[in-house]
Amino acid sequence: MLHEVSFQSFNERDTVYGWIYVPAAPAKGIVQLIHGFGEHSRRYLHMIVKFMDAGYIVAADDHVGHGKTAVENGTWGDWGDKGCHTMMEDEHTLTLIAKEKYPGLPYFLFGHSMGSMIARDYAAKYGSELSGVTICGTCGVFRGASETAQKLSEAIAQGRGKESDPSFTADLLGWMCEYCGDTSIGNEWICSDPYVQRDHADDPFDAFTKPTTNQSMYDFTQMMEVINGTEWAQKVPVSLPIYNIAGDLDPVGEYGEGVYAVTNWLRSTGHNVKTKLYSGYRHEIHNYNDIKDAVEAGVIAFMDENL
C-alpha cells in the first residue's frame, strides 16, 4: 500500500509532499528515510523495497526546494526564510503523520548526507521519540563551511538572499572531486559507478539542476554548524542507539576522519554508537551494485536489534 501525504512546511510557505510505503505483511516498525542535498526521496526505491521486505513501513518526503515539493510549489533551490531547522521540523511533522496512521510501532530514522545532518538535528530535539537512528555519509566539521557562511552572510546583508550565486556552491562543494580523476560530469565524488553519476546528473528531479538561493546555502552551512561537537552530542538522548556508516573515500566525511569525529563526540558523551566504514567506496554506499545489499542488510539488522 502507498499513501501520498502532504503538509504545511515549517517555512510557512510551501506544501511538502511525501509518501508512506506499507508492506503487505504486518509491520514490525517504521523507518523514516531522509534524503540529501540536491536529490529526492525516490532515488532510494531500492532501499525502500528492502526495508518493506524486512517488515518496515517507510515514510519519506521531498524537502523544501527539492523534488516534487519544489515542482509543486515552484521553489527549486529555495528553502524559505525560517532558518536551518526547517527541514528537521518538516521531518518531525512527517513522523507525527506516520505515527498517527500506524501507532505503537518502533520508529527509526535513516538519513543520508544532508539527510544525516537533519537526522542528527532531529535526534538532538526529538530523540526521545525514536528507537534508533542510522546516519549515512555524514560529516564532521565540514571543510570550508565557516568561511563560505561568512561570505553568504555578507551577501544576505546586502539584500542578495533570494539571489542564486553559484560561486558560493563552488566554494562549499567544489573541492569534493579532488581525488576522483575524471571529473567531466562534476558529481563523481558521489560514486565511482558511471551509471550512478549519469543517472544523478540527468534526473530532472535532482535540485542540482537548479541553483540554490544564497539564503538557503547559508542555512545549509548552519545545519552543519548546529550538529558539531560535544555540545550537539549532549543534546541527544544517551539511550538512543546510533549506527554511523560511510565510505572511506567519501569527501563529505573527510575520508573517514569526519565520520569518526562524530562517533567520538557521541562516545565521549556516553552514547551507544556503532560505526562502519566501507573500504574503497565514495559517498553513496547504498548505490554501489556490489555492496548495496550488504549496506541495506546492515541497517535492517541494526533496526531489528533495537525493536
Task: Name every feature range the model reports, one short phrase each.
Residues 79-99:
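Alpha/beta-hydrolase active-site loop
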